[in-house]
Amino acid sequence: MDGVLLLNKPKGMTSHDCVAKVRRLLGIKKVGHTGTLDPNVSGVLPICLGKATRIAEFLTGATKTYEGEVTLGAATSTEDADGDIIAVQTVDRTIARAEIEAVFRSLTGDIEQTPPMYSAVKVNGKKLYEYARAGIEVERPTRRVTIYELELLDEREQFVGETVSFRFRVMCSKGTYVRTLAVTIGERLGYPAHMSDLIRTASGPFQLADCVTLEEVERRAADGTVDALLIPIEQALFHLPKYEISDKVAEKVKNGALLRLPAFLQELDGPVLLVTPEREAMALYVKHPARPGVMKPLKVFR
């Protein structure tokens, strides 16, 4: 059983929990996900099965899209709704839609983020959340991320109340902390804030509408039709150049043979996916670093 399963991760489960559940339901060992979602976040979680576990690293860097909610007036220890409230300030003025949209424009493009203390980023070999649970604050390295699009989904022209919540959609690069983005939005509007809801609606080309629930996976496992849910490796790596090889060459590829680099790939910068005439993915190859005109295996899907 090889391919990518598009799971609609439910709230309340870790990404690891989902992998373990799929492993049990399908009775296979090689299962892995392509990018962690926090327990309180639902949505698109691509899960790689069998040979597809070897391509996980080529899917994790995909652009992500989320729909979420910012709540102004309260900050939390985790920057989301699960944490302890650490700051409160009544929203004592009317906030205009134009003001929020101006903040969104200011946060579009390349920005610097400091990972939250409750995150899996490692500092000195230890995950930040481990320091946080021990009550230890450590210096965290900033990271540059890209916000491609940031859109206000709420249709109101004015926002009034002791606390104010509004929904947004963001398309961003790998490694973006959307809860930290929510806090920054609040800061620029002059109030403590946290992310009160979040759902991942897309990961690269994979859309929420194409995802299945764990309950659906369980039903399909019971009637033996899980394979129909899987995206083949060749399709999952749609963004990579393809090179069709004969069945004879495919046998050599299985053994990790070096191959002549075809003319149309001379400018290749990164991996190319080798496929059979039947579109079966055989391997990922890259230019040989020391032998011009030759390519060597990076990953072979034996």
UniProtKB/Swiss-Prot annotation:
InterPro entries for the chain: PsdUridine_synth_cat_dom_sf, PsdUridine_synth_N, tRNA_psdUridine_synth_TruB, TruB_C
Upper taxonomic classification of the species? Bacteria, Bacillati, Bacillota, Bacilli, Bacillales
Show the active-site residues. Answer: 38 (nucleophile)
**Family indicated by similarity:** Belongs to the pseudouridine synthase TruB family. Type 1 subfamily.
A GO molecular function term, named singly, is: RNA binding
The answer to keyword Hydrolase applying to this record is no
Name of the protein this chain belongs to: tRNA pseudouridine synthase B
> Keywords assigned by UniProt?
Isomerase, tRNA processing
> What's the catalysed reaction?
uridine(55) in tRNA = pseudouridine(55) in tRNA
Organism of origin is Geobacillus thermodenitrificans (strain NG80-2)
Q: Which domain of life is it from?
A: Bacteria
Any one GO biological process: mRNA pseudouridine synthesis
Q: Does the keyword tRNA processing apply?
A: yes
* EC class name: isomerase
CDD domains per the record? Answer: PseudoU_synth_EcTruB
The gene name on file is: truB
Per the UniProt record, which EC number(s) apply here?
5.4.99.25
- Described purpose of this protein according to its UniProt entry: Responsible for synthesis of pseudouridine from uracil-55 in the psi GC loop of transfer RNAs.
